[in-house]
Regions:
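Mid-domain Rossmann-like dinucleotide-binding core that forms the NAD(H)/NADP(H) cofactor-binding site
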Residues: 82, 138-216
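Glycine-rich cofactor phosphate-binding loops and adjacent beta1-alpha1 units
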Residues: 200, 204-284, 344
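Glycine-rich beta-strand-centered segment in the early N-terminal region that forms part
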Residues: 20-34, 48-98, 132-134
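Residues in the short beta-alpha loop(s) of Rossmann-like NAD(P)-binding domains
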Residues: 195, 265, 291
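NAD(P)H dinucleotide-binding glycine-rich loop of Rossmann-like/cofactor-binding domains
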Residues: 91-169
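C-terminal hydrophobic helical "lid"/dimerization subdomain
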Residues: 247-251, 293-345
């Protein structure tokens, strides 16, 4: 089959690879929709991900498709079933799984390989995070399930209440999804981010106001403007993953407020905090990571009910054969929110 194989830092090659034979309890999915993701871009730039993927390996993890092969142990999953699968499944046995924190599982089993014609799904994922689609659900919509589940986890961690004022920092796909879910929670949402079109999309998705920050050099001035013109927010949802925006969250939240440090920074990154403000303002810092089987199902519910639509997030298309060029373009800063990768069949 054709697949995009990650060999190392900024080294992706589309080539013919053999399909892996299925083990008992596994299924194979013919991939009908695969989407780009900021995490995949990080993997492309760094050449690996300590938890998710070690090269050489087929990469990509947001996908939906149709079951094309089953093994006797995969009961209840017929060939032809339309499905979406998450990119991991917890063990169900460790301390964190037993305490309802499956996203922190000590033995998360990750699945990569969305940028290919098909993918073999391990038995644990079949059991825990393989979901049927309604006949009316499009594959492109369904492929949003995994990132939306991560955002749903982050929003749940914020414990939002109707009427709260929320600032989302970042207008990429994660920030846009956070905007939708915060608005759905009855909150008033403002967005600080880059890119005219992305900020326009934030408003279309329910943001009250948007604050442009077109270059990193503008960020200190943007903060001063924000602080001078606005009351601090009840909740700040950071969806960029840079020390400057993490630190900004602690400056823009009100006394007693909560900052969700959702955007992941590179390992070893340090940030500076005003300890006096942290202590005397009673701030809560919360970090959210990944998803659980519950939030995977919640995400698909939001998609199938029409709350989240691919049309609002997927604004680019690219054939699998051009994937290396696409990631180079993404690395250089193209402004697509998400791109659908189409398999050349």
């Amino acid at each position: 089959m054709k697949a995009a194989v990650l060999y190392g830092k900024e080294d992706v090659r589309v080539e013919e690879v053999p399909e892996r034979a299925l083990a008992p309890g596994e299924v194979r999915i013919r991939i009908e929709a695969a989407l780009t993701c900021g995490t995949d871009l990080k993997v492309f730039k760094r050449g690996y991900h300590a938890k998710m993927i070690v090269p050489p390996a087929v990469f990509g993890h947001e996908l939906a498709g149709e079951i094309s092969e089953v093994t006797p142990g995969a009961r209840g999953w017929p060939v032809g079933e339309r499905v979406v699968v998450a990119n991991s499944a917890p063990c169900g046995e460790c301390f964190f799984c037993r305490n309802g924190q499956e996203n922190l599982c000590d033995d998360l089993l990750f699945l990569n390989g969305a940028y290919a014609e098909s993918i073999a799904v391990p038995a644990r994922l079949v059991q825990k995070n393989l979901l049927r689609l309604k006949p009316s659900t499009g594959f492109r919509d369904a492929a949003l399930t995994e990132p939306l589940a991560c955002v749903a986890q982050g929003i749940a961690d914020c414990q939002l209440r109707a009427g709260q004022r929320v600032l989302v920092i970042g207008a990429g796909p994660i920030g846009l999804m956070a905007t939708v879910l915060a608005v759905q929670s009855g909150c008033t949402v403002d967005v600080l981010g880059r890119g005219k079109q992305r900020l326009e999309r934030s408003r279309a998705l329910g943001a009250r106001t948007t604050i442009p920050n077109d270059t990193p050099e503008d960020f200190p001035e943007s903060l001063r403007t924000l602080l001078a013109a606005n009351e601090p927010w009840d909740v700040v949802f950071e969806a960029v993953g840079k020390p400057a925006t993490w630190e900004a969250g602690t400056q823009l939240v009100r006394k007693g407020g909560l900052v969700n440090l959702f955007g992941g920074c590179p390992a070893g990154t340090k940030m500076a905090l005003d300890t006096g403000r942290m202590h005397y303002s009673g701030l809560t810092l919360k970090a959210s990571f990944h998803h659980t089987p519950r939030t995977i199902r919640r995400a698909l519910e939001l998609i199938e009910s029409g709350v989240v639509r691919a049309a609002d997030f997927v604004d680019g298309e690219c054939p699998l054969s051009r994937l290396p060029e696409l990631f180079k373009s993404m690395s250089a800063g193209n402004r697509f929110v998400k791109t659908q990768v189409q398999v050349d069949r």
